[in-house]
Amino acid sequence: MHDTELVKVILGLQADIAALKRMVAGNLRFGTVKKVDHDTKRVQLLLSDANGREFLSPLRPWGEIAGTEKSWRPPTQGQQMMLVAPHGDMRQAVALPMTYSDQNASPSSDPGTRILSTFGGATMLFDGGGDRAE
């Protein structure tokens, strides 16, 4: 192999590595809900890049239970979510609910209790021992 051919191969490999790094870096991103479009069931997240610069995601669907059983739990502004984008491709991305935050704290720390808390203050509470259901 001649030097010029070797240089071309190395440059091609460098380009491939750079593309793979971008794909891996874009697979999972964490952000907060900026906008919810209830009609199209899509959400826009405020994300940041590796340098800390903020940017808005495109409107992407959020994950829900959607088989025979269905759920409707639209995200709310400020909620933390994870954007899963196969191969870093935002066109395929889906937003999934994430962790608690200062704005959206956990409703309990009791390991024996299950709570579903909704907007408007309504709460369903189940005690693991079967003693309570509210």
Please describe what each predicted stretch is:
Residues 131-134:
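Short, intrinsically disordered, charge-balanced linker/junction segments flanking boundaries
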Residues 1-129:
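Exposed beta-strand/loop interface patches that mediate assembly or binding
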